[in-house]
């Protein structure tokens, strides 16, 4: 019996080692502004890795879930969401890691989506304001808020639910995907009337919207 257990144990350890060498479920990849580094979340922590390849560096080690990293325009800061205080809040840390700073404190979940500039972050939240102040009242649809990297009181940036926002360098336009109804974003090959589309928004006094994609899938 002992002779049978040794090969089985060796096979198990070999499989475990192979699994460690080929990690899966790395999510929310974000390329640094200079294109040299990729930030991503893996098993509840934030990592960075050179875009040319190499060993990943772990930036957060908290037992809570850290996810959705986004870079500041100068590439010196990374904002991310963490539920280390109960619900998900927006945190800010240096690109090398270190002690992060908590920026939001609302009781609902909040997720960073992009930096407006080096001093301001746009994030998604559902603060449940009065119906007159939001596009679609309810708990399912979030709004876009803006907060300083120093913290403080957030401002409503858009009552329209915008996901995966990308601002142009001059800040005059933004790309985003819409949200028509609930669908698992990780579902593959989904096509229906509620799949997300990409839109281009021209900011300014006369704000305009242009639909970029018409594909029936995500």
Model-inferred region functions:
Residues 6-14:
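Bacterial N-terminal signal peptides
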Residues 50:
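Periplasmic/extracellular electron-transfer cofactor-ligation site
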Residues 30-35, 69-77, 112-121, 165-173:
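Blade-terminus and WD-like Trp-Asp/Gly-His loop motifs, strongest in beta-propeller folds
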Residues 15-19:
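Sec/Tat signal peptide C-region and signal peptidase I cleavage site
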Residues 21-23, 41-47, 55, 60-66, ...:
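A flexible loop/linker signature enriched in serine peptidases of the S9 family
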């Amino acid at each position: 019996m002992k002779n049978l257990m040794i090969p089985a144990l060796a096979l198990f350890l070999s499989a475990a080692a192979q699994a460690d060498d080929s990690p899966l479920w790395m999510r929310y990849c974000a390329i640094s502004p200079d294109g040299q580094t990729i930030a991503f979340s893996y098993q509840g922590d934030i990592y960075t890795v050179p875009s040319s390849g190499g060993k990943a560096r772990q930036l957060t080690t908290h037992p809570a879930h850290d996810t959705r990293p986004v870079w500041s325009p100068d590439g010196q800061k990374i904002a991310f969401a963490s539920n280390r205080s109960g619900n998900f809040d927006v945190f800010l840390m240096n690109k090398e890691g270190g002690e992060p700073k908590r920026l939001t404190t609302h009781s609902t979940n909040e997720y960073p989506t992009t930096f407006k500039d080096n001093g301001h972050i746009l994030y998604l939240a559902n603060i449940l304001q009065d119906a007159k102040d939001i596009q679609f009242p309810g708990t399912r649809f979030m709004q876009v808020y803006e907060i300083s990297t120093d913290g403080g009181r957030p401002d409503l940036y858009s009552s329209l639910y915008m996901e995966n926002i990308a601002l142009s360098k001059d800040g005059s336009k933004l790309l985003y995907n819409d949200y028509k109804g609930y669908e698992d974003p990780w579902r593959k090959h989904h096509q229906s009337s509620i799949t997300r589309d990409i839109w281009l928004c021209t900011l300014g006094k006369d704000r305009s919207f242009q639909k970029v994609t018409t594909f029936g899938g995500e």
